[in-house]
């Protein structure tokens, strides 16, 4: 069941992504901003519903396929992703989208602030990644950097 809020000409929909997006027509969305579960980051059940990384990435790839289907040719995608699977996520995105940039959000009051940093065995992430992409328009052409080889 979807919860819908209308603000002026915008409609915000809170629903299961894969269920709802399948109801949308092709090339009908200008912008997708999504913050899917990161898998094994939070203790809640919704973030741990997959059997392993491969299972999670298969689910995310299904989402990406639907994003590509509904996104207009000049549309944009902003996908928030956790640090652990950011590389895998980007590689999957590049199969369908032209990844334009990585946005690194430095979180001033992230959960790392209250942790015992001395007891950690790795650096605790103080940032969040956002992958910015556009609809794939054909075979990828490496852009010239303007320098002669």
Language model feature labels by segment:
Residues 2-149:
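Core catalytic lobe of class I
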